[in-house]
A protein has these predicted regions:
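Short alpha-helical transmembrane segments in multi-pass integral membrane proteins
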Residues: 1-21, 79-146, 188-244, 300-365, ...
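N-terminal transmembrane alpha-helices
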Residues: 8-40, 44-45, 59-74, 78, ...
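Transmembrane helical elements of multi-pass membrane transporters/channels
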Residues: 19-38, 140, 174, 203-207, ...
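Helix-terminus/linker motif at the lipid-water interface of multi-pass membrane proteins
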Residues: 29, 33-52, 121-128, 184-191, ...
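Alpha-helical transmembrane segments and their lipid-water interface positions
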Residues: 31, 35-42, 65-72, 76, ...
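Small-residue-rich hydrophobic transmembrane alpha-helices
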Residues: 51-111, 148-167, 274-338, 369-391
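Short runs within selected transmembrane alpha-helices of multi-pass transporters and secretion channels
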Residues: 141-159, 167-175, 196-211, 290-293, ...
Length: 446
């Protein structure tokens, strides 16, 4: 295994996780940055309807991207298992299966999303002032879904072999291109929402092209050739057994957030615009838990494959302690500095106030989610994704959506109350996995 690929099965646990998590976090920061740049530049050069359109449209595209990333986690885990088992040919077969599988998914999603853009905007209850712009944003981004999928599949494969540095490089390229594209299309040519969407798709296209060029020159701990680009039924079954439950879990979670978006849209244009700003800030706030989850999944996958269960447990606990320590700091920033953070995206004082209100209610989740995401990462890495799916479905439909609706209908309600629905949901998730861990240990002791 080359120096660029990290072996999680040997060496100090904390250092191994940290070496992997830092570039993962860096990639997530840059990925969130080029998503936030759209809203930031549109907010500076456009109006509230444009902010609402990009906020609502990007929420849906974020959902689609998360689903793809979650399904690709099946590939990450299976490749990690093969690496831990020292079976490079089987790892290559998993890569080939992944390429064909996601190519089929990309073609289907492109056609479906293009034709369904209007219905999606209606379901999201986009405000009348921003309805047409929301449709436009979704359609342009949907045209580039193949590119979005390609990037996430490449990143998933690289994480499976323990390489988090190249995804960081590729997303860095996309971020720079997107910033330049937004400034040109939105700031100079005044293309508003359309310019932001075009810049995002083009940026990822450039990133994918660069990734293909770089990967052709890389040595990785797998045996892979073009002839392996086909469906291997055995590998497909393994990938889907892990990836589908994770994707279903993520789908329900993202649908629940879209429902929350819809609930807030009914509160008016300003709350809708404020929530759009807040969600972009949240996308940054949640990067630490997300990097922890991806790191734990890769760490556990390799160690389970190598038969080192005690080391997998040690990595899990180390990730929780590290993540929560950073989460406390992020909580303070989100709770007390929400207004300052929101002002980077817009000059509208009312939109800033609405965004800051939501962040106050939400910010406790910065700490809680580090525990939840570490648990999800552990079960994903073990290949036990059914509990993850059950937790996601029940938390979305039994907790987050009902609590959000109730909070939005309280007398003299505000986005602070709606924002509290997320940490309340996370507490449920932590309790759920505490029970699952107890059952897992009980069965292992028999």
């Amino acid at each position: 295994m080359s120096k660029k690929e990290i072996s999680f099965t040997e060496g100090p646990v904390f250092q191994s996780l940290l070496r992997f998590a830092i570039p993962v976090l860096g990639a997530l920061i840059l990925q969130a940055a080029y998503g936030a740049v759209d809203l930031l530049i549109v907010g500076k050069f456009g109006n509230a309807s444009s902010i609402s359109a990009v906020g609502t449209g990007s929420s849906f595209m974020q959902m689609a991207t998360f689903i793809i990333t979650s399904l690709a986690m099946g590939s990450t885990v299976i490749i990690g298992h093969h690496i831990g088992e020292q079976k490079p040919k089987e790892a290559g077969n998993a890569v080939g299966t992944t390429i064909i599988l996601f190519l089929i998914i990309a073609v289907i999603m492109t056609f479906v999303l293009e034709f369904a853009a209007g219905g999606i905007a209606h379901l999201l209850q986009a405000p009348a002032e921003s309805f047409d712009k929301t449709i436009l944003y979704i359609r342009i981004c949907s045209a580039g879904i193949v590119i979005i999928i390609a990037y996430n599949v490449i990143s998933g494969v690289l994480r499976g072999v323990g390489n988090a540095n190249l995804p960081l490089l590729f997303v860095g390229i996309a971020c720079v291109v997107n910033i330049l594209g937004d400034l040109l299309l939105v700031g100079v040519f005044h293309m508003d929402v359309a310019g932001a969407a075009i810049a995002t798709v083009f940026a990822q296209f450039v990133s994918v092209v660069c990734s293909v060029v770089v990967l052709r020159k890389q040595d990785m701990p797998i045996e892979f050739s073009r002839e392996q680009c086909r469906i291997y039924k055995k590998e497909l079954g393994k990938i889907l057994n892990v990836g589908v439950p994770i994707a279903l879990q993520e789908t329900t979670v993202q649908i629940s957030f879209l429902v929350v978006n819809s609930v807030i849209n009914q509160m008016g244009l300003m709350p809708s615009a404020g929530y759009g700003i807040a969600q972009k800030i949240v996308s940054f706030i949640m990067l630490v838990p997300s990097s922890v989850m991806q790191s734990v999944s890769a760490f556990v996958a390799q160690n389970i494959g190598a038969g080192k269960k005690s080391r997998a447990w040690k990595g899990f606990y180390t990730a929780i302690i590290t993540g929560c320590s950073v989460g406390i700091i992020i909580f303070m920033v989100g709770f007390f500095g929400g207004g300052v953070l929101s002002s980077f995206f817009t000059n509208d004082s009312e939109v800033i106030a609405q965004s800051a209100a939501y962040l106050k209610g939400f910010s406790a989740d910065c700490i809680l989610t580090c525990v939840l995401f570490s648990s999800i990462g552990y079960f994903n890495g073990c290949g036990k994704s059914i509990p993850v799916m059950i937790q996601g479905i029940t938390s979305a439909f039994c907790i987050r959506i009902p609590v959000s609706i109730i909070m939005s209908r309280l007398p003299e309600t505000s986005l602070t109350y709606v924002g509290m629905a997320t940490p309340i949901t996370t507490v449920y998730g932590i309790i759920f996995f505490a029970i699952c861990f107890r059952l897992l240990n009980k069965n292992a002791a028999k």
